[in-house]
Amino acid sequence: MKCWRLSAILFLGFMLTSLSTARFVVEKNSLSVTSPEKIKGKHDSAIGNFGIPQYGGSMAGNVVYPKDNSKGCKDFDSSFKSRPGALPTILLLDRGSCFFALKVWNAQKAGASAVLVADDIEEPLITMDTPEEDVSSAKYIENITIPSALIGKSFGEKLKDAISGGDMVNVNLDWREAVPHPDDRVEYELWTNSNDECGVKCDMLIEFLKDFKGAAQILEKGGYTQFTPHYITWYCPHAFTLSKQCKSQCINHGRYCAPDPEQDFNTGYDGKDVVVENLRQLCVFKVAKETEKSWVWWDYVTDFQIRCPMKEKKYNKECANSVIKSLGLDVEKIDKCMGDPNADTENSILKEEQDAQIGKGTRGDVTILPTLVVNNRQYRGKLEKGAVLKAICSGFEETTDPAVCLSNDVETNECLTNNGGCWQDKTANIAACKDTFRGRVCECPLVDGVQFKGDGYTTCEVSGHGRCKINNGGCWHDARNGHAFSACLDDGGVKCQCPAGFKGDGVKNCEDIDECKDKKACQCPECSCKNTWGSYNCSCSGDLLYIKDQDTCISKTASQAKSTWAAFWVVLIALAMIAGGGFLVYKYRIRQYMDSEIRAIMAQYMPLDSQEEGPNHVNHQRG
């Protein structure tokens, strides 16, 4: 036992050497004092690493400082549960004398909705964490559900002075900006461990992996998230690489190490066994990602914990390979990825893990196991499905939240009550309220390809082509006796105009015009007018026929006679045109013929201009 203690001290020294330059970033949330006026303003507070911070949300409450038990290290005699209609109670406690988690647990049991712990010294804010491997605290830590935060000493004194002076102190805790939310995809990473014999924290981690697997795979398969697993490793100082402690806890000649699972170098599994399995799980993720099925990692780690536990002496390569094969992964590829743990060379996979432990930008170094990082910000709070899902969902840009983030278990749908105070058309069942993880957004909707325009709160009007398909464009419409009329003009505008035969504003009403009464039609002496909805019927007396365009009545026989004479004249004109055309053709042909005959006769007696004059040869005969 003495030897083990010495070894543990040496290994702790190795860890401290590797973490001596670590940069731990305290994750904060905004705290605003809304009253009294004299201390009104914004302040920083450090999010506690237990309980359930309301990531993506906020809480307004009344601050109460107990006169007795001001440190909250024992049960409270009075209740801090708020009355119906009153603001939630936020209990202010002093630091010291007991664990932070115990203070919050006692406050939760007394009915407080949140806890502020005032520091007892002037120093930069720190993160309130859970006790390490404390069996008694494990009983209540996992049951803490309220959020908590540490505040500076001077700010705490101001709050206490205001309360003791009789002022009502109201504050607003805001976690909406605790996680960046730049776009529609969340990048998150989990720093975990394959060791299942490291106590309470390992048990909590195993349960979390099982519970969160389903949600994680839905998010990953849908392309909503990009998940990366990580594993913390340390190195053994070069001077101790040949020591028993380094040989049992490290691979690759002291380059990559993990603590002994049972904290006993002489029994059970060694730390190097944990490092090898951690490496295998990293390679499972790498190979699965290459096949575009990165979510299979969740299946492997949960199956391995069930099928290959240390307690049953199955924490080995053979059991791991059986799990890998059952998931359809290539064992040879994974073995090749792992490399040789006994070689005196660097392992590229584990070297990347050591480099990744060092914080970059706003993210601090990873020093707590397990650690969840969402959009490059370290998560603070209970490692529980609902709490972690809230943190991840708060990383999506508004209105891009996947369905899993909008379930009743994760958030409250503010659109269900009075439509969130947004515009709505109950008739068409259309509303501007959009439920998001951070709360409702009033935004005019897009329905069936038609965009509504407006402020989203009081007005949303359809516009553009196709608008008449949506609740008739907000215009008047009616149907009677099989006839339908609409005041909507589908010309890309927003105008409503009563159709022909109606008058009105086109929006709320269009009244039928009585053309007969108003003498707008059917006014000829022989006409008989009867009004109809949206039009009129006009008939003529006797055998007369009504011509609507001329608003007149004519005789059917006269009409027929006119039609006959019209046909006669059409035929006659056609014949005349044919005869005239024929005569012109005949005349043209005769003239051509006569011209040719006359020219032929004249050509016999005299030369014509069109003929070439030939040479005149005279023959002289000489005797």
From Swiss-Prot:
Which segments cross the bilayer? 565-585
Q: How does it assemble?
A: Interacts with the N-terminal propeptide of aleurein (proaleurein).
- Tell me, in one coarse class, where this protein mainly resides: membrane
Q: Which InterPro entries match?
A: cEGF, EGF-like_Ca-bd_dom, EGF-like_dom, EGF_Ca-bd_CS, PA_dom_sf, PA_domain, VSR_TRX
Q: Does the keyword Transcription regulation apply?
A: no
- Topological domain spans for side Lumenal: 23-564
Would I find rRNA processing among this entry's keywords?
Answer: no
Biological-process GO terms, alphabetical:
protein transport
- Which compartment or compartments is the protein found in? Membrane; Golgi apparatus membrane; Cytoplasmic vesicle, Clathrin-coated vesicle membrane; Prevacuolar compartment membrane
Q: Which UniProt keywords apply?
A: Calcium, Cytoplasmic vesicle, Disulfide bond, EGF-like domain, Glycoprotein, Golgi apparatus, Membrane, Protein transport, Repeat, Signal, Transmembrane, Transmembrane helix, Transport
Give the protein name, as stated in the record: Vacuolar-sorting receptor 1
What organism is this sequence from? Pisum sativum
Its organism's taxonomic lineage begins at:
Eukaryota, Viridiplantae, Streptophyta, Embryophyta, Tracheophyta
Bridged cysteine pairs (disulfide) = 415-433, 422-442, 444-460, 468-488, 475-496, 498-510, 540-553
